[in-house]
């Protein structure tokens, strides 16, 4: 019943959800974080040693053109034309389906409305859409453990900050990079830069292919490449934005953990979980995301700031030699 109402009246339900759980102050804070991460990603693109100036310029144009959607739509959908009656479940579903089809048909021969959302506000998820070059963060993901307006920057940048950076990085991953700033399927990379990107991406594929997720079963580095690149970029970009924020608002050690350590702990906390062996096998075959455990244990060994935060050495089990680490978004800027 809930899924039916959610499907037929998604934004009407979303409007009630937002009124109860997502104050305007949270949206303002999120807008600032997104701006900070856009700046950090722009700085990182500018300082990449392997990318040419021509491709960098196009990448910056695409980044600047991002459409940002946070919390809920600026204008709520009008459901006044949908009649809900106390006659039968089937009749209400039929009327809602007709209403939805007519809503879509009304768009025929009209320009694409880029203000519309591809997710309802009550959805715990986020997305990047390459055909519209937009990033979207519904109100429901802007709750703990992802976002807490009462928490400090270490927690929020480590959790929702990485999600923001993750979605932004999708615009430049193995699939997103094939679209230009206007969402057109167009190659804007030089041939040499594309080759360098693919070489670096292959390091990621090989690393995840080597991970044994269950006895005799390995992760699929090719299937999960885009999401792994996005996690890799999201961590680096969010950490850079976090360190920049601390220049004007320094944080203290809490419960024995430095701000930098708490950033990475917040990230790990988001993906903490436990699933059955059968689900591990199913997700490994079908899901383009790595398993939660490996979104942490597979991503952090390629982040230099994580090594520095926890004093990781070659004697630690998660240590990966520098020449074996992924370096797609490795910047010349030292944080």
Language model regions located:
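Intrinsically disordered, low-complexity linker/terminal regions across diverse proteins
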Residues: 2, 6-10, 14-332
